[in-house]
Amino acid sequence: MASTTELASSFIEGAPPGEHLLARRRRRRYAMQFRPFISIVAISIVPRTKPILSSSTDVKALTSDGPDIIPSLAPAFERYNETQLTTVKLPGASQEVLISEYNKLEGNRYFDVESQTSFEVDHVTQEASAAQSYVLESQNADLIKSLLKSLSAHATEHYRTCSYGVYPIEDDTAVAIVLVANRYSPNNFWNGRFRAIYTLPVNSSSTTISGQIKVDVHYYEDGNVALNTNKPVNLSVPSVDASSIISRIAAAERDYQEELNRAFVSTAEGVFKGLRRQLPITRQKVEWEKVGGYRLGQDIAGGR
């Protein structure tokens, strides 16, 4: 049987994007209907302004360990932040930078190439601190900076809010191109996240970009509907040129968006429509003040 820590960790790592907003703003309204789910989510992703330990009352309601369980969940928070490409604000700065396995240093430190900064991250509170100057040491530094410039233009053109990064990986034989865009709309009961990770080999005779595009959306008004997609991507580029590489990536993301749109239309007109209950057409007005006394099989159908 799984331990309390293992169960709590699995909830944390599987939490939908932005659900801390639901947990705090909608907690009273949904407390009875979704109490276990909301409580777990409330401790898994936190608003920028309040530490996760402020949700200790929720933890106490779910586990006998109460807030004492938080330290044992640190690995789960770290995995979540790196996998979901969580963004943090650098101290004294307005821009957000992302956290991933590709820009990780020793301990809980990460680096951002564009701002030339390394920083420490508290994975529980999702806050950055101890920022220091950082100089990228890579034989592909010029390519990385060129990719960042083109990626910045792509992000500005196609995403309302977006964080991105380009990092040397695999002993400097390849670079990782990483992008994340979040849209949170708790007042309309939905939150979403777009993630894209691409690997570009730089010391290969054939230049093929491989990667994945992931879209996660959660809709929770009077229900609980989630969209989780994972699209493998393989792109051939004629040369290791930053402009052409980002152009191919932009085309792949646009094509996938159109593919998702077609899938939504097909699902709405097919599967979802088939789920609706088909009621008989009687061409008779319904007397709503008497609806509580109707015998559905007879009165509505006009029978006696």
Task: Kindly label every feature range from the protein language model.
Residues 65-66, 70-159, 195:
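Long amphipathic alpha-helical scaffold segments
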Residues 1-108:
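Alpha-helical protein-protein interaction scaffolds
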Residues 9, 23, 31-32, 142-149, ...:
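Polar/charged alpha-helical tracts
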Residues 13, 32, 36-39, 75, ...:
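Extended, non-membrane alpha-helical segments enriched in charged/polar residues
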Residues 30, 80, 102, 110, ...:
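Sequence-level detector for tyrosine residue identity
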Residues 145, 149, 153, 157, ...:
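Surface-exposed short loop/turn segments
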Residues 52, 61, 75, 79, ...:
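C-terminal/domain-edge helix-coil "capping" segments
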Residues 125, 129, 195-196, 242, ...:
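A generic structural signal for ordered alpha-helices
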